[in-house]
Curated annotation (Swiss-Prot):
Residue stretches spanning the membrane: 23-45
Lipid bilayer topology: Single-pass type I membrane protein
Gene that encodes it: cpna-1
Subcellular localization: Basal cell membrane; Cytoplasm, Myofibril, Sarcomere, M line
Protein name: Copine family protein 1
Entry GO MF terms: phosphatase binding; protein-macromolecule adaptor activity; ubiquitin-protein transferase activity
Compositional bias segments (type: Basic and acidic residues): 492-501
Signal peptide: none
UniProt domain VWFA: residue ranges: 863-1023
Biased composition (Low complexity): 478-488
Expression across tissues: Expressed in body wall muscles (at protein level).
Regions annotated as coiled coil: 67-124
GO biological process: one example: protein ubiquitination
C-alpha cells in the first residue's frame, strides 16, 4: 500500500495482515493426467458408438441382401416353372390326341425291345427251347403272340415240374446256375417250341438207377449268362436273385399271368381312345379329354385334375341335366326357333373344366342346390319375358370356365349376364303365365338387339312358382302340344322389384298397356279430396293474395269435364279445378297412359259485377271473370298490381330452391295451414310455422340465404342501410319517395283501369259465376293482397279492414293500407278526443289512464311475450346511453334498459292479461345463436306475474354467455306457435340493442306473422343504429295489416323531464297502434270475437252523445 500524508493515517498504527494461504486440490501433473484421460475416454466412447452403429448397419444390410437374393431366386424359379408348365400344357384336343398317338408308338417300341431282350435271355437260359426272334410283327398282333408264348412257357414249366425227380434232385445245379429274371416292363413272349423228349428220358433213367440227379453233360448244362450292371440292379430291385428255383419259377408264372391280364386291357383302352378320336374328327367337333393321358401324368405329376367319378349321384344328375334345354313352356313360334337352333348345333352343351380334388361337403351341396333352383327360375323367367315381348339378345354361350365356376360356386359369388340369349336357357318352371293384356307375339330379330339399345324392364311378374322342375328335350310333337296348351293368357300376381335386383333385364323399348284400337280409354273418375287438401288448394290462390275472395271451403260436388268449346262468361257456379300434383300439358297427355285423376273443388263466391277476361291455352279456351271494384282508387289498384307481381315472382323464385337437410324452410312455413271445422262455418287454422320452434335448431344464416340481386324486392329489402347511416331527418323523405313512386305507377295504369271499368259496366246487371282454370293461368288485375282468415270466416267485404255492418260508402284507400294512415285515424286519438300526439301526451298523465283509454278503444284481453337480446353487442351498446356500462348490468341500485322496458309495458298491459301468463325468451346467446331461442323460466313454463318476470331475468342474465348474431325470426316463429296453441291475442315485445344481421329472414317472419293474432313491438335499447327497424315499420307492403311497430327507448327517455314522464311517453308510443291492430285481427277472422269500432265511429258517437 502506498502511504499518503493527506490521508491522515499513521503508518505505525497500521495492522499487518497475514499472507493468504493457497490450498491446491490437484497438482499440475494430476490436472494434465485427468485432462488426457477425459479426452481419451471421449474418443473411445464415440469410437465404440461408431463401431456399434456400423455393426448394426452391417447386420441389417446382410439380411436385406439375403432376402433380395432369395426373392431373386424365387422369381427365377417361378419363371422357370411357369415356362415349363406352359410348354407342357396342351392347347387343344388335337394336340392331346397327337401326344397320345406318339406315346402309344413309344410304348409299343419299348415293349418290342423288352420282348426281344426277354427272348434272347430265354434262348440263352433255355437251350432246349427254340424261340422265334422275328419281332417284325405289328402291335395289333402282340396279344396273339403273347398268348402263344405264355402257353409255351406254361407247358414247359408244367412238364418240368411233373418230372419223376427226387426232392434233392429238384435243387440241382442246373437250376441253381440259371438265375430267374423278373422283367420290369411288360414282357411279351413269342412262339416257343415244346421241350425235346430226350431231356425227359435222360432224367428218368438217371433217377431210376442212381436215385439221384443224373449227371448232365457239360454241353447240355446251361452256363450262367453274364449279367450286365443294369440287369444286376434289376435283380436286386426285385429281390429274387437268391430265391429257390421253384419260387423263382412261380414268380415268373405269376408275373406273366398279371401281364396277360393287364396288357390286353391297356391295349383295349387305347383302341377305344383311337376310335373315339376318329369319330370326333369325322364329326368336326373335338371334345376335351376328361381323363388325363399317361403322358400328362408322367410329365406333370403335381398337376391336379378333376375326376367326375368323385361327384355324388345328385351332383352328377344335375350336371347331366344342365346340358339339355326345356322349351316346353315357350310361346308359339319360340319353340320352333329353339328347336331349329338345337338341331343346327347352336345349343351344344359346353363341357365344364373343373379342377377339384375332393368331394363336396354337405353345406356346399345344399348351396349348390339352392343356387341351381334360383338360377333356373331366373333364366326361365327371363327367356319367357323376352320371347313374349318380341325382345332378346345375342345367342351366345358363356365362357366355359365362367359356367364351370357358376355351377359349383355359391350363389353369392356368382355373376352372370342377364342379357345372354337363348343359348343359356336353364330348366324352367312348369307354368309361366303370360300377361293378360298382351297377346302372344312372334319372335323377330332376336340377334339384332344390342345392349346399347336396351332399357330396364321388370320381369318379376313371372315368378309364379318357387321350385323349379327339370325336363329333358322334348320331341317336336310334344313341343307343339305344350305350345297350344299355353296360348291362353292368365292373370298373374304382380310384384315390384328394384333396379338392383336380379329380376331386371333389358328390353329394347318400354312396354305399355294400350287399350284396343278404336276404343277410347275410359276417363278415370277424380277422387274426392279431404278438407285438409281443400284448404291447401285455397292457399295456392291466397298465400300471396292473388285477388280471390274465398271465405271458406264449400262441399265438394260433381266432376267438371274439361271444356271442348269456348264457354260464355255466364256460369252457374265457379269451378276451381286444381290438380293435386303438377300436371303436364293436356295435349301432351292425350297419346300417353291415362292421366291421374284430378281434384275438383266447387267454391261459391259472392255475386259481383265482374269483367270477363279470355285466356286461351292451345285448342281449349277458358273464360273467367275477376271481380274489380269500380270505386277503388286507381292508385291503390296499381299499387296492388305491383304487389301481386312481386308476390308471384317471389313464389316462383322460392319454389326452385330446395330444402337443405331436414331443416324447415320459411317458404314451407308460409304455405302450411290446417283447416278446422266449426258448427256452422269453416275455419282455417294455420299450421305450426316452425313445428318444434326451439327444439329444431337451424342456423338461419344457412337457411335464409340472402339474395343479393332481388330486383323485385327493392321496396322492402334495403341492404345499403347496413353500411350507410341515414339521418333521422331524412326518413320522412324516404317514405314520401315511396308514395311518389306509387303515384307515378298509378298514373301510368289509370288508362288501363278505365278500360276495365267500361267492360265492367256492360255486365253490371248479369249474374256471373266464373270458371277459373289452373292457377298458373291467372294474372293479377289490380286486386290488393288479402289473406284467408285463420280462425274464422271473414266478413263479406273487399277491404282487409272493411266491415259489412258499417258505413255503406265506398272503400277508401286507407282501408287497403291502413298502416299509412293509421295514426290519423287512431282509436286512441278518437277516444281521447285529440288529433295529435302532443295533445295525447298531455291528456295521458299515467300508465293507468293509458290502460283505460286502450280499453275504451276496444282492446279486451291480451297476453305478453318478452324477447330478450343476449348478443355480445350489449357490452358496448351503452357507451353513450348507459354510461359506458353493459346493457345487461344487474345492480341493486341501478335499473338497466331491459328492466325498465319490462316494467313499463308490463304495468300498462297488466289489466288486459287474459290467461295470466307471461312468456320470457332469450335469443342470441352462445347456445342458441341466431337459429333458436331459450325459455328463461326453463322447463317450468311461463311466469305468472310481472315481478316473477323481473326475478327470472335478474337470476338468469348473469349466467348467460353473450354471443350473436341478432335474428328476430326464431323468436317470431316461437310467438306464432304460442298463438296457434292458445288461440288468443298476444303482443310480442322484442327488446334488442341493434338491428338484425339477417334482415331477409326477419322480414319474412314478420310477413308470416300477419296470419296470426300477434302484434310485434320492437323496443330499441342502446346506441343503435335503428335504420332497419324504421324501414320495417314504414315500408313492408306485403302485409295486409300493420303488425309491426318500432320505438327507440333512449330517444324517448332523454327528451323526458322526469322518469314518470319518460315511462308514459314510452308506453304511449309503444302501444299506440295496439287497439287498431286488435280491431284488424278481429275483422280478418283471426280471432272469433266481436269487432271493436273504428276510430271514426268512436268520434261520431262521442259527437252525438257528448258526456
Amino acid at each position: 500500500m502506498v502511504f499518503d500524508a493527506r490521508l491522515g493515517y499513521d503508518p505505525d498504527e497500521w495492522e499487518e495482515c497475514p499472507e493468504p494461504e493457497h490450498f491446491l486440490v490437484f497438482s499440475g501433473f494430476t490436472r494434465y493426467m485427468l485432462t488426457f484421460a477425459a479426452i481419451a475416454f471421449v474418443y473411445y466412447f464415440f469410437k465404440l458408438l461408431d463401431d456399434k452403429n456400423k455393426k448394426e448397419s452391417g447386420e441389417k444390410e446382410e439380411p436385406q441382401t439375403s432376402v433380395e437374393s432369395v426373392l431373386a431366386k424365387a422369381g427365377d424359379k417361378l419363371h422357370d416353372v411357369k415356362e415349363q408348365v406352359q410348354q407342357h400344357i396342351p392347347e387343344s384336343a388335337e394336340e392331346l390326341m397327337r401326344e397320345a398317338d406318339q406315346y402309344l408308338k413309344e410304348q409299343a417300341h419299348s415293349v418290342q425291345n423288352n420282348v426281344h431282350q426277354f427272348a434272347e435271355q430265354a434262348a440263352n437260359k433255355f437251350p432246349s427251347l427254340e424261340v422265334d426272334l422275328n419281332l417284325g410283327h405289328p402291335i395289333d398282333a402282340t396279344r396273339e403272340k403273347f398268348d402263344t408264348v405264355l402257353s409255351s412257357v406254361n407247358n414247359h414249366l408244367h412238364e418240368t415240374k411233373n418230372m419223376d425227380l427226387s426232392p434233392t434232385s429238384r435243387d440241382s445245379t442246373q437250376f441253381e446256375q440259371i438265375p430267374s429274371i423278373a422283367p420290369e416292363e411288360s414282357a411279351f413272349g413269342h412262339d416257343f417250341e415244346h421241350v425235346p423228349p430226350h431231356l425227359k428220358t435222360a432224367a428218368e433213367q438217371y433217377y431210376a438207377q442212381q436215385h439221384q440227379p443224373p449227371p448232365v453233360p457239360q454241353h447240355k448244362i446251361v452256363q450262367p449268362v453274364p449279367i450286365s450292371p443294369t440287369d444286376q440292379q434289376l435283380l436286386h430291385e426285385f429281390d429274387i436273385y437268391d430265391a429257390p428255383a421253384h419260387q423263382r419259377m412261380n414268380q415268373i408264372s405269376e408275373q406273366l399271368g398279371q401281364l396277360g391280364q393287364k396288357t390286353p386291357a391297356q391295349l383295349q383302352q387305347l383302341q377305344h381312345a383311337q376310335l373315339a378320336h376318329q369319330q370326333l374328327q369325322q364329326q368336326g367337333v373335338f371334345q376335351p379329354i376328361q381323363q388325363p393321358s399317361p403322358l400328362q401324368i408322367q410329365t406333370h405329376p403335381q398337376q391336379p385334375y378333376f375326376d367326375f367319378s368323385q361327384l355324388s349321384p345328385a351332383s352328377q344328375a344335375r350336371y347331366n341335366q344342365q346340358q339339355f334345354v326345356d322349351i316346353s313352356q315357350l310361346s308359339p313360334g319360340a319353340g320352333a326357333l329353339i328347336a331349329e337352333q338345337q338341331a343346327s348345333g347352336a345349343f351344344q352343351p359346353v363341357t365344364k373344366k373343373l379342377g377339384r380334388e375332393k368331394r363336396l361337403s354337405e353345406q356346399d351341396e345344399r348351396a349348390l342346390q339352392d343356387w341351381e333352383k334360383e338360377k333356373a327360375l331366373l333364366e326361365a323367367d327371363r327367356l319367357k319375358k323376352l320371347l313374349d315381348h318380341e325382345v332378346g339378345g345375342d345367342s351366345t354361350d358363356l365362357d366355359s370356365s365362367q359356367k364351370a365356376y357358376d355351377h359349383f360356386a355359391p350363389a353369392s359369388h356368382i355373376s352372370y349376364e342377364s342379357h345372354s340369349g337363348a343359348a343359356q336357357i336353364q330348366p324352367m318352371t312348369p307354368t309361366a303365365p303370360k300377361r293378360a293384356d298382351v297377346p302372344a307375339p312372334q319372335v323377330t330379330s332376336i340377334t339384332n338387339v344390342r345392349d346399347s339399345q336396351l332399357t330396364d324392364y321388370d320381369i318379376s311378374d313371372f315368378h309364379a312358382h318357387d321350385e323349379p322342375h327339370y325336363h329333358t328335350v322334348l320331341t317336336p310333337q310334344q313341343l307343339q302340344q305344350n305350345q297350344q296348351q299355353h296360348q291362353q293368357p292368365s292373370a298373374i300376381d304382380r310384384r315390384r322389384t328394384t333396379a338392383d335386383s336380379d329380376d331386371y333385364v333389358k328390353v329394347s323399348e318400354p312396354i305399355y298397356d294400350y287399350p284396343p284400337k278404336g276404343h277410347e280409354a275410359p276417363v278415370a273418375e277424380p277422387k274426392r279430396i279431404s278438407p285438409t287438401e281443400a284448404a291447401q288448394l285455397q292457399e295456392l290462390y291466397q298465400e300471396y293474395d292473388l285477388g280471390l275472395d274465398l271465405p271458406g271451403v264449400a262441399p265438394i260436388q260433381g266432376v267438371a269435364k274439361p271444356p271442348v268449346q269456348q264457354r260464355t262468361p255466364l256460369q252457374i257456379q265457379q269451378q276451381v279445378v286444381q290438380n293435386v300434383q303438377n300436371q303436364p300439358n293436356m295435349m301432351a297427355r292425350q297419346n300417353s297412359v291415362p292421366e291421374s285423376p284430378r281434384t275438383v273443388i266447387n267454391v261459391p263466391i259472392s255475386r259481383k259485377t265482374d269483367v270477363p277476361i279470355q285466356v286461351q291455352q292451345q285448342q281449349n279456351q277458358f273464360s273467367y271473370n275477376v271481380p274489380i271494384q269500380v270505386k277503388d282508387d286507381p292508385r291503390n289498384l296499381a299499387t296492388a298490381d305491383l304487389f301481386v307481381q312481386d308476390a308471384q315472382e317471389y313464389v316462383a323464385h322460392q319454389q326452385n330452391q330446395q330444402d337443405k337437410g331436414s331443416f324447415v324452410m320459411e317458404e314451407e312455413m308460409l304455405s302450411l295451414h290446417e283447416p278446422e271445422t266449426g258448427s256452422n262455418k269453416k275455419k282455417l287454422t294455420p299450421k305450426n310455422p316452425s313445428f318444434e320452434a326451439t327444439s329444431r335448431q337451424v342456423r338461419t344464416n344457412d337457411v335464409f340465404e340472402r339474395i343479393e340481386h332481388d330486383e323485385h324486392d327493392d321496396m322492402t329489402y334495403a341492404p345499403e342501410i347496413q353500411s350507410v347511416e341515414i339521418p333521422p331527418d331524412q326518413m320522412s323523405e324516404t317514405s314520401e319517395n315511396m308514395i311518389d313512386y306509387f303515384d307515378k305507377v298509378a298514373a301510368e295504369s289509370e288508362q288501363q283501369i278505365q278500360h276495365l271499368q267500361e267492360q265492367q259496366n256492360t255486365l253490371k246487371k248479369q249474374q256471373i259465376e266464373t270458371s277459373i282454370p289452373d292457377s298458373s293461368l291467372l294474372k293479377p288485375v289490380g286486386r290488393a293482397p288479402q289473406i284467408l282468415p285463420a280462425f274464422g270466416n271473414r266478413i263479406s267485404s273487399n277491404s282487409s279492414l272493411g266491415s259489412a255492418g258499417r258505413s255503406g260508402s265506398g272503400v277508401s284507400s286507407s282501408d287497403v293500407y291502413p298502416y299509412r294512415h293509421l295514426r290519423k285515424q287512431s282509436s286512441l286519438l278518437s277516444v281521447l278526443g285529440v288529433t295529435s300526439m302532443q295533445e295525447m301526451l298531455l291528456a295521458i298523465t299515467s300508465l293507468d289512464s293509458l290502460s283505460e283509454a286502450m280499453r275504451k278503444a276496444g282492446l279486451e284481453t291480451t297476453n305478453l311475450i318478452f324477447g330478450i337480446d343476449y348478443t355480445a353487442s350489449n357490452k358496448y351498446q351503452g357507451e353513450e346511453s348507459f354510461g359506458g356500462r353493459s346493457l345487461h348490468t344487474i345492480h341493486p341500485h341501478v335499473t338497466n334498459p331491459y328492466q325498465q322496458v319490462i316494467s313499463i309495458l308490463g304495468r300498462t298491459l297488466a289489466p288486459f292479461a287474459g290467461q295470466g301468463r307471461l312468456g320470457v325468451y332469450g335469443f342470441g346467446d352462445a347456445k342458441t345463436g341466431d337459429w333458436s331461442v331459450f325459455n328463461l323460466k326453463g322447463e317450468g313454463g311461463d311466469c305468472r306475474s310481472l315481478d316473477e318476470v323481473l326475478n327470472v331475468y335478474n337470476t338468469v342474465t348473469p349466467t348467460v354467455a353473450l354471443s350473436g348474431p341478432t335474428n328476430f325470426a326464431p323468436l317470431i316463429y316461437q310467438a306464432m306457435e304460442i298463438c296457434q296453441k292458445s288461440r288468443d291475442y298476444h303482443i310480442l315485445v322484442i327488446i334488442a340493442d341493434g338491428q338484425v344481421t339477417n334482415e331477409r329472414a326477419t322480414r319474412r317472419a314478420i310477413v308470416q306473422a300477419c296470419q296470426h293474432p300477434l302484434s310485434i313491438i320492437v323496443v330499441g335499447v342502446g346506441d343503435g343504429p335503428w335504420d332497419m327497424m324504421r324501414i320495417f315499420d314504414e315500408s313492408l307492403p306485403k302485409r295486409p295489416w300493420d303488425n309491426f311497430h318500432f320505438v327507440e327507448f333512449h330517444e324517448i327517455v332523454k327528451k323526458s323531464t322526469n322518469m314518470e314522464d319518460g315511462d308514459v311517453k314510452l308506453a304511449v308510443q309503444s302501444l299506440l297502434e295496439i287497439p287498431d291492430q286488435y280491431r284488424c285481427i278481429c275483422e280478418l277472422g283471426l280471432l272469433d270475437r266481436s269487432i271493436p269500432p273504428r276510430g271514426s265511429e268512436i268520434r261520431r258517437e262521442m259527437m252525438h252523445n257528448p258526456l
